[in-house]
Amino acid sequence: MMNRRSMLALMAGAAVAPRLSFAADKPYRLAFYANVGAELWHYDVNIDTAELTRRGSVKLPASVQYAWPHHSGRALYVVSSNGQAGAGGVHHAAVLRLDHANGDAALLGTPVALPDRPINVCTDIPSKNLLVAFNQPSGVRVFRIKPDMTLGGEIAQGKLDGGVYAHQIRVTNDNHHAILVTRGNDPTPTKAEDPGALKFFDYADGHLSHEYSVAPNHGIGFGPRHLDFHPTRPWVYVSLERESRLFMYRLAQGRLESKAAYDVDTLKDRRDFDPRQLAGAIHVHPNGKFVYVANRADGTEDYQGRKVFKGGENSIAAYSIDQQTGEPRLIQFADTEKIYPRTFHIDPTGSLLVAEHNIPLDVRDGKGIGRVQAGLSVFRIGADGKLTLVRKYDVDVGKDTMFWAGMVAVRA
């Protein structure tokens, strides 16, 4: 049972725990990375002008799925896949060494082959272990991280319930628990809905145990995609992909509460809600005062003999966070002015937000047809948490897609 002293220790640990953005406790070089297929591109970041300058790239064994930095800021762990199951599958976890002098990335060691498509990855808080989530079959595997930051062997786990269609794995700020976010699947004319759940585990030195599920209504109508933690309070913010909603849960006495404390909409207008309208990535601002959720839409309809965008919300929903209760309160919908912002990230100072968009798509343009390119939207974050779109970058993806993008504080 967690007493007052242990709860205070947990919160203190959360306050100093490393995050993906990293606290600005030591000099670092800010780098932005975004993929096109198997190529991971590196961009310099100018926070003052909100500009991204593309420098170079490194090629992974297959299309990038997700990435996560070593807590030192000197390496990046990247999972990749060609998306094919069975014998035709090419799935790997790779380590990239990051050069503090220029931010460039280069392979460190040999990529580790994985049995199935990896959809998400993270390290534990001290970066002693790498946790990899797989969507089908749904589950999680854990690998040792060696002192030289390369990957060691897989850590055997007991029997784990991986739910249906895992989409994210995260370790809590105190390093004592892990949450596997399992989205489930919508019903089809021939198949019933697959339930979603948050799979909560005890976590110790790479070992997952004592799993239990948070699944309202037995997971029906509950399709979580991603979550993020408040930096200093025991609050967990969850984006529900299939429902386009934002839930806030509390961590209490070492457990995730079974009922969300708050449930808010992520959409501006639900009158034309479409199955291809989905909530996506979620990030809490480094200062803990705001939380942001991506809204994605890419549904098409026939127009002049071509498939064109049929409408929907492609935006970042911004919320202020009540610092006493954790309640998220809507303050803005910021249009990304591109299609399908699959991922976005915030720099360590909390000044910039960059959203990545997967593919180009034809759109209605007056009486004709135009085209919105894949690419990046760069926003300035105000002191009030609101976003101002500063510039957009078109990216030629050819037959590939953009799938992941993130900021990393690269350290010497």
Model-identified regions with their sequence ranges:
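N-terminal export signals
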Residues: 6-23
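Short, solvent-exposed loop/turn segments at conserved positions within beta-propeller repeat blades
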Residues: 36, 85-90, 135-138, 188-196, ...
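Short loop/turn segments immediately following beta-strands, especially the blade-tip
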Residues: 44-49, 97-103, 144-150, 202-207, ...
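A short beta-strand motif characteristic of beta-propeller blades
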Residues: 53-58, 107-111, 154-159, 211-217, ...
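Blade-loop segments of beta-propeller domains
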Residues: 56-123
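Beta-rich, blade/repeat-based domains predominating
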Residues: 61-72, 114-126, 160-175, 218-235, ...
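Asp-box/WD-like beta-propeller blade repeats and closely related beta-sheet repeat scaffolds
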Residues: 107-170
